[in-house]
Structures are given as C-alpha cells and as structure tokens.
Curated annotation (Swiss-Prot):
A cellular component annotation (GO) from this entry: glutamyl-tRNA(Gln) amidotransferase complex
Protein name: Glutamyl-tRNA(Gln) amidotransferase subunit A
Classification via PROSITE patterns: AMIDASES
InterPro entries: Amidase, Amidase_CS, Amidase_dom, AS_sf, GatA
Catalytic activity entry: L-glutamyl-tRNA(Gln) + L-glutamine + ATP + H2O = L-glutaminyl-tRNA(Gln) + L-glutamate + ADP + phosphate + H(+)
Length: 492
C-alpha cells in the first residue's frame, strides 16, 4: 500500500489486522519520512533501531492474533516525559545528558497498548513557550508555508515538535503536555487535532514538572477519532500521582459521529471584541457557529466576565510554581554541573543554573520568585489564586446552561518563526484563548476549522465541563465531518 504515513490510526490498525502491510512497513515508512524532513527539527532524539525492534514484536503479536489496541502505531513522545534508558532533556542544556531509570505513566500506557516510539519530540525548554524557539536543540519549523511567501513559520509551543511531526507525517500521533495551551495552540498552527483532558485524568508521573497545578498530558493527532483512541488509552488512575483522579474512563471513541442535534453550545460573544483576535479568526468562529446551528445545535450567549484576567493570573501562578519546581536543578544531585575557581556550593549553584537554563526559563523563574517574595506574595500570588477561583466560577455558571463552549484556539494563524522573539508579552498573548480552560482544569480540544487568506490552518476550540471529554469529542467530530476539509501542508 502506498502512502502508509498518511493513514489515520484507525485505518492503520485495520490495515495491520487485515495483513495489508506489516508494522515493520509502517515504522520504516515513518523513519524514511523523518529522514526526508529532518530540517523541520521535530525530534531531539531518534531511535530507529529500537523502533524497528518493537515493530518486529508487533508483527509477531498481530500474526498470532494477540494485537493490543494500537499495535504497531508509530508515535512521537515529547521530550518532557521520562523514558527509561533513553535521553530525556526537556529541551534544556541543564538536562542534555539525563537518562531516566523509569518510564512516565502516560508514555508506558501508550507503549503497553502497542504504540511504537520513533523518538523524543522537540519542544520549548521545560515547556515554557508558545513558538518552539526556546529549545536548546534549535527551533522547530512549521511544515506549513503561507501562500504568499516561503518564510519559515512557528509550529506553536511548547509541543511544537509534536505538532510538526504529526502534520508532516513523521508520526501518527504525538504525546504532548498542556499547561496553558501547549497541545491546543500548536495543533491550531499546524492543522492538527490537539486534546487536553480534565486535570487529573492523565497521570503526571514521570512528566518533568513546570507548573504542577496546571500541567496535564495531552495528545496530537490528525483526526478527532484518532485523538479519542489515544486519549482513552492514556487516561486512568495512577497511585503514583497524588493529583490523579480515580474516575471511570469513558468510551471516547463511541462519541465520534454521534448526532449533536439539541445540544447547547455557549458562545462568549464579548470575546469577539478582543483586539488580539484577527478578523480571519472571528470569521472562522462565526462560520462554525452557523454550521452548528444548521445541525440543530442551540447557540446560547454566555458571559465569562473574568476571562480577560486569565493571562496575568496564569503567568503569576505558573511562574511561581516553576520557580519552586526548578529549584531542584542545582548542579549537585543531577543535571548540568559547572564548577568555578572556588568550587563552593553557592558558586556551583549560580554557575550551573546560569549556564544550564535558557533566557525564557530564567525570566519565568525570576517572575515567580518575585511573586512569591514575602513582600509581594499577598499582592501577586494570593490575589492570582483568588481570581483563578472567579474564573472557575465563571465556567461553572456557564456549564449550568450549556453542554460545551466554543471559542478559537489561537488569536491568529501561525506567524513567522523569528518575529516577536524579543517581545515576551506579545508571545504570551498567543495563549490568551487556551489559558482560561487550563486554569479551570477543564477538558478541551482544538480542531482545524478553516484557512487564513494565506492558506494557513486555523483552529477552533471546544471546551467541556469537568470530566466531560465525551461531549467535546462529540461536538468536534461533528464539526470535522461537516467541514470535510483536508489539512495537508503544501508539498506533503
């Protein structure tokens, strides 16, 4: 079969089961694709030999009718997840030589279900960024190009390597992480599907911490059905994670292609007045609303009065937690160690952290340390926690009236890779639409729903009430099916 890399996961699972091709064929095709498009820089570490060994095992299991749910499916794993015996760097010089002695739970669930890791996906250092320009291992390039020029575009961040790999057919799915939009925003920029479950649905065990009250594993695929397949595998209680929820895992795949007539979708119309949103994004939003109306969905106007405070709240809280979490990288226990002339402990701390962390990570640590200082904690950290509760209440009140909420995933289409690099506030605004749901711990999905004038993909976001991943799959699947658009980068 030609074009194995362009199959969906559900198609590939069916093809493997019917002996139309082998797992070795499928993995080899993806390795060849990785070789062909290495300039995209999607991977930090590639493991083709190990992947082919795993493919042989999958072929044996398939041959003996012992196939697991995603037997033989090639995946990318964000380099934030610990992988036993395989380099795990968090895209930082600080961890450039770190090899874990255990596997992250989310990763092991995928492997135990038959998934085959092709390599570790590039990302913003310690998951801090929205353009994948903060990696010690170089920028990731979006496979998409604007129709008007050949300028390299950002794939989004922090899971930019993950989204680029899936968009460029270098993986059928990618395990990512989402703290303030790091799965959904890259999906929006690359014409892929990115889903973040409710906080606590997927174990954080073995995922290098950025902001513990916000971090959550997520997944990037090319279809809603594939996202449902992968997320269902990843979800479930884990006693090793104190924030893990002991809740029943729903049959997410069954939500695909379900009728949506009679469902209620909330629209915060005030958000359309936000000057950060491009006219193309607002047009896509309005078109999606009309599409849902045509399918019998009731559109309800809702108010989210505190949503405009989400961005500053997020950067105070996430930076505060990051300054605490990253204190462990001191050059003594593990990670980069730099010794000076005197080699006293304070000098080792200072030199190791100065050389090991990149500029954006240092900026976040400084912001967090400032917010937690005894003179500032009441004005910044405590106040941010209080406003976070108001944002949660906004969503709770809205979900008393609607099943899901519909807003865009990003304020614009993908932008040039080298623009705004020296303007952190402008870069932070890229997450303005994804952060609110993260602060509330809600499940949300980004699906490609239109194109810009320059033929770049635009993403639409469906937000569900807590633990209601089922309905966001249901709505997004209906939108995907009704649009029936192909999101394939030019030349692929």
């Amino acid at each position: 079969m030609n074009n194995l890399v362009k199959l969906t996961i559900s198609q590939a699972v069916s093809g493997l089961k019917n002996k139309e091709f082998t797992a070795t064929d499928l993995v080899t095709a993806h390795i060849n694709q990785m070789d062909k498009y290495r300039y995209i820089n999607s991977y930090i570490t590639e493991i083709p030999e190990l992947a082919l060994q795993a493919a042989k095992k999958s072929d044996f299991l398939i041959q003996n009718n012992q196939a697991r749910p995603i037997e033989g499916i090639p995946v990318s794993i964000k380099d934030l997840f610990c992988t036993k015996g395989i380099l795990t760097t968090a895209a930082s010089k600080m961890l450039q030589n770190f090899t874990p002695v255990y596997d992250a739970t989310a990763y092991s669930k995928i492997i135990n279900a038959g998934g085959i890791m092709l390599g570790k996906g590039n990302m913003d250092e310690f998951a801090m960024g929205s353009a994948n320009i903060n990696s010690y291992f170089g920028n990731v390039i979006n496979p998409w190009k604007a129709e008007s020029d050949d300028v390299d575009l950002t794939p989004g961040g922090s899971s930019g390597g993950s989204s680029a790999a899936v968009a460029a057919f270098m993986a059928m799915a990618a395990l990512g992480s989402d703290t303030g939009g790091s799965v959904r925003q890259p999906a929006s920029y690359t014409g892929t599907v990115g889903i973040k479950p409710s906080y606590g649905r997927c174990s954080r065990w073995g995922m290098i911490a950025f902001s513990c009250s916000l971090d959550q594993p997520g997944v990037i695929t090319r279809t809603v059905e594939d996202a449902a397949i992968m997320l269902e595998i990843m979800m479930g209680y884990d006693e090793k994670d104190s924030t893990s929820l002991n809740a029943e895992v729903p049959n997410l795949r069954s939500a695909v292609n379900q009728p949506i007539k009679g469902m209620k979708i909330g629209i915060p119309y005030d958000l359309m007045e936000n000057r950060s949103l491009s006219s193309e994004i607002i047009t896509m939003w309005q078109n999606t609303i009309n599409l849902l109306k045509d399918h019998g969905v009731e559109i309800v106007s809702i108010g989210l009065p505190y949503i405009n405070y989400a961005l500053p709240v997020y950067y105070v809280l996430s930076s505060a937690e990051a300054s605490s979490n990253l204190a462990r990288y001191d050059g003594v226990r593990y990670g980069l160690r730099v010794e000076g002339k005197d080699s006293n402990i304070n000098e080792i701390y200072e030199l190791s952290r100065s050389e090991g962390f990149g500029a954006e990570v240092k900026r976040r640590i400084m912001m967090g340390t400032y917010a937690l200082a005894s003179t500032n904690i009441n004005s910044y950290y405590i106040k941010a926690q209080q406003v976070r509760r108001l944002i949660v209440n906004d969503f709770t009140n809205s979900f008393n009236k609607v099943d899901c909420i519909l807003i865009p995933s990003a304020p614009t289409a993908a932008f040039p890779l080298n623009s705004n690099q020296d303007d952190p506030v402008t870069m932070y605004l890229n997450d303005i639409l994804t952060i609110p749901a993260s602060l509330a711990g809600l499940p949300c999905i980004s699906i490609p729903a239109g194109f810009s004038a320059n033929k770049l993909p635009l993403g639409m976001q469906v937000i569900g009430s807590r633990l209601d991943e089922y309905n966001i799959i249901k709505i997004s699947s209906a939108i995907e099916k009704a649009l029936n658009l192909k999101f394939i980068p030019k030349g692929f």
